[in-house]
Regions:
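A short, exposed helix-loop element centered on a Lys and neighboring polar residues
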Residues: 122-123
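Conserved glycine-rich cofactor-binding loop
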Residues: 12, 19-21
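The beta1-alpha1 cofactor-binding region of Rossmann-like NAD(H)/NADP(H)-dependent oxidoreductases
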Residues: 45, 64-76, 104
Length: 143
């Protein structure tokens, strides 16, 4: 267990970008600590792998294949969520390029995902949360 002294029994957590990497690790750690988890990613294959691991922990797990920069998709997802206690707004990207070589289009994609989508999701999450909700926004902007 990643979080020995941390318990979130019967809480509902939503983790964006949870098909791989940090998001996957957060989703699994929250399930190990007792949470039911809603996972979001663009790749269904990755989500199914994470969902199977969470279900082996005897926790509920639902998933949504989506592009979190698409506000219409995100609004639809949040319209289906009745309860949310924890948000890990993990989806993010960067452009590993010299600053002088980054194209404006690429920078716009980074801003759309790392800033605008994170804002939209956090704002929508506040409409379905219960008191003492935890919002985590680990996305950082790196140029």
């Amino acid at each position: 267990m990643f979080l020995k002294n941390f318990t979130v029994n019967n809480k509902t957590a939503l983790v964006t970008g949870s098909g791989k990497g940090i998001g996957k690790a957060c989703a699994l750690a929250l399930a190990e600590a007792g949470a039911n988890v809603i996972i979001l990613s663009r790749t269904e294959k990755d989500l199914l792998i994470v969902q199977n691991k969470i279900k082996k922990l005897k926790k509920k797990c639902s998933y949504y294949v989506c592009d979190v920069t698409n506000l219409k998709e995100i609004k639809k997802i949040f319209s289906e969520i009745n309860k949310l206690d924890i948000l890990v707004n993990n989806a993010g990207t960067n452009r590993p390029e010299y600053f002088t070589k980054i194209k404006r289009k690429d920078m716009s994609e980074v801003v759309d995902l790392n800033i605008k989508a994170s804002f939209d999701i956090a704002q929508l999450a506040t409409k379905v949360t219960v008191s003492y909700t935890h919002l985590t926004l680990p996305t950082s902007v790196t140029v």
